[in-house]
Amino acid sequence: MPQSKSRKIAILGYRSVGKSSLTIQFVEGQFVDSYDPTIENTFTKLITVNGQEYHLQLVDTAGQDEYSIFPQTYSIDINGYILVYSVTSIKSFEVIKVIHGKLLDMVGKVQIPIMLVGNKKDLHMERVISYEEGKALAESWNAAFLESSAKENQTAVDVFRRIILEAEKMDGAASQGKSSCSVM
């Protein structure tokens, strides 16, 4: 097997949308039912995707809102971003659009590896954001999209596998662009 690659992923979103729950479900395989606001935590996990082993460093950020100022560290050495909203919260869906815009401004690129995640899909009776709305938003950003339930462990692993694939796809496009040569 090839040497493992290191990738750093930041998880961003509005308060109490399940960023930490999704991350802990992926890393430790358990759901934390209590809400304890995160300042910032970093987790590590080894995962194999398409035969390649990845050493992931996951930056679980504090909840942001439309007035949050992003620390510069959110743009340094980050290989991909998971943007999380709750399918039970219109506010979180609106704020994720603001977060996306601020992220693009901070990183200084139009296209970055992003995975949009609609979390809490197990709360059917409280749903206010449809799957189609989430998918349409992701498509408008040219981002990957999944809905998830950290509580029921639905697609937690898929979310992190997918962001790795998105990051690798962009890395491939970047390295292909670098290898081309023009003589004038």
UniProtKB/Swiss-Prot annotation:
Consequence when changing residue 8 to R: Decreased ubiquitination by RNF152. Does not affect polyubiquitination in response to amino acids
Annotated catalysed reactions: GTP + H2O = GDP + phosphate + H(+)
Binding site for GTP: 16, 18-21, 32, 35, 38, 119, 122, 150
Lipid bilayer topology: Lipid-anchor
GO molecular function, one term: magnesium ion binding
Residues of the signal peptide: none
Site label Important for autoinhibition of GTPase activity, positions: 35
Sequence positions bearing Cysteine methyl ester: 181
PTM notes: Farnesylation is important for efficiently activating mTORC1-mediated signaling. Polyubiquitinated in response to amino acid, promoting its interaction with MTOR and mTORC1 activation. Deubiquitination by ATXN3 promotes recruitment of the TSC-TBC complex and RHEB inactivation by TSC2. Monoubiquitinated at Lys-8 by RNF152, promoting its association with the TSC-TBC complex. Deubiquitinated at Lys-8 by USP4, promoting mTORC1 activation.
Effect of residue 38 to M: Slightly impairs signaling through mTORC1, but still binds guanine nucleotides normally
Glycyl lysine isopeptide (Lys-Gly) (interchain with G-Cter in ubiquitin), cross-linked positions: 8
Top-rank taxon, per record: Eukaryota
GO BP annotation list: cellular response to nutrient levels; negative regulation of cold-induced thermogenesis; oligodendrocyte differentiation; positive regulation of oligodendrocyte differentiation; positive regulation of TOR signaling; positive regulation of TORC1 signaling; regulation of cell cycle; regulation of macroautophagy
Regulation: Alternates between an inactive form bound to GDP and an active form bound to GTP. Inactivated by the TSC-TBC complex via the GTPase activating protein (GAP) domain of TSC2. Autoinhibited by Tyr-35, which constrains the active site conformation, restricting the access of the catalytic Asp-65 to the nucleotide-binding pocket. Specifically inhibited by NR1 (4-bromo-6-(3,4-dichlorophenylthio)-1-(4-(dimethylcarbamoyl)benzyl)-1H-indole-2-carboxylic acid).
Entry keyword DNA-binding: no
Enzyme Commission no: 3.6.5.-
UniProt keyword list: Cytoplasm, Endoplasmic reticulum, Golgi apparatus, GTP-binding, Hydrolase, Isopeptide bond, Lipoprotein, Lysosome, Magnesium, Membrane, Metal-binding, Methylation, Nucleotide-binding, Phosphoprotein, Prenylation, Ubl conjugation
An example Gene Ontology CC term for this record: spliceosomal complex
Quaternary state and interactors: Associates with the mTORC1 complex (MTOR, MLST8 and RPTOR) in a guanyl nucleotide-independent manner. Interacts with TSC2. Interacts with MCRS1; the interaction maintains RHEB at the lysosome in its active GTP-bound form and prevents its interaction with the mTORC1 complex inhibitor TSC2, ensuring activation of the mTORC1 complex by RHEB. Interacts (when prenylated) with PDE6D; this promotes release from membranes.
Name of the protein described by the UniProt record: GTP-binding protein Rheb
Organism: Homo sapiens (Human)
